[in-house]
Curated annotation (Swiss-Prot):
GO BP: response to hydroperoxide
InterPro entries to which the protein is assigned, alphabetical: YaaA (IPR005583)
Superkingdom classification of source: Bacteria
Pfam families: H2O2_YaaD
Protein name: UPF0246 protein BT_3869
Any one GO CC term of the record: cytosol
Lineage: Bacteria, Pseudomonadati, Bacteroidota, Bacteroidia, Bacteroidales
Alphabetical list of NCBIfam families matching this protein: PRK02101.2-5
Family affiliation: Belongs to the UPF0246 family.
Length: 257
């Protein structure tokens, strides 16, 4: 089974965690070209393009200006992203075996690097899928990547057993020809809901935390089938058979009943 996670907006360039090996991103050339185009924008332009405040725009202006320098720090992707999902995944205590398993069974989306393996070394950046770069065909990055990633993604899923556990946010489907993905491999999407005022609700922060915890559960326990995945339990979230089906595994937290 292959797990798909979304990239995070927040990144670090420093980590004390040791990994057994590192690899180069498979779409390094494309990433370098995208970063080069992004380096042409001013701070004000980045603020508008990325819909961020001035401080974040300045930070990413500096990142893009230094992106191609030999001295710019790099980190394995699994350590570089620092959002809620990755904090809960918490690879700090991963063994060499855990990292090796993750390399084969986890993929991370990236608007700059396309599709990443956990040990692919990357540089910090900030980007959105709806950014249009005229030099790359005047199309959104979603469109730019779709034709480039789909074959590789399907091959990765097949190599990992032919089942995709989709723990990425919904917008990431647009990076791939998703209909083709669903027609060629089995896709299972876990959902996380809580009872609130007598109704089922989706709370974003709980969803992100649960995605990270589930990914950790899969990698640490070498979970290979949706049936095994039903055994996931965390902070009150339990599998609910009545709300689930072949494509959707629903986990419910009854704290607000």
């Amino acid at each position: 089974m292959l797990v798909l996670l979304s990239c995070a907006k927040t990144m670090s360039a420093v980590s004390k965690v040791k990994v057994p090996l590192t690899t180069s991103p498979r779409f390094q050339k494309e990433a370098a070209e995208i970063a080069l185009q992004m380096s042409q924008f001013s701070v004000d332009e980045l603020e508008r393009l990325l819909r961020v405040n001035a401080k974040i725009a300045v930070e990413n202006y500096k990142r893009y200006q230094a992106f191609h320098a030999e001295t710019t720090p790099e980190l394995p992707a699994l350590l570089a992203y620092t959002g809620i999902v990755f904090k809960r995944l918490n690879p700090k205590d991963f063994s060499a075996e855990d990292f090796g398993y993750a390399q084969e069974h986890l993929r991370l989306t990236s608007f700059c690097y396309g599709l990443l393996r956990p040990l692919d070394v990357i540089r910090a950046y900030r980007l959105e899928g709806d950014v249009v770069l005229p030099e790359l065909g005047n199309q959104t990055l979603f469109s730019y990547w779709r034709s480039r990633l789909t074959d590789t993604f399907i091959e990765d899923i097949r190599s990992a057993g032919g089942i995709l556990c989709n723990l990425a946010s919904d917008e990431m489907k647009s990076l791939f020809d998703w209909k083709r993905v669903e027609s060629e491999v089995r896709v299972v999407t876990p959902e996380f809901h809580v009872w609130k005022n007598g109704k089922l609700a989706t709370i974003v922060v709980y969803t992100k935390m649960s995605r990270g915890e589930m990914t950790r559960f899969i990698l640490k326990n070498k979970i290979g089938t949706p049936e095994e995945l039903k055994g996931f339990s965390w902070e009150g979230f339990e599998f609910d058979e009545s709300l689930s089906d072949e494509r959707k595994l629903v986990f419910i937290n009854g704290m607000g009943e």
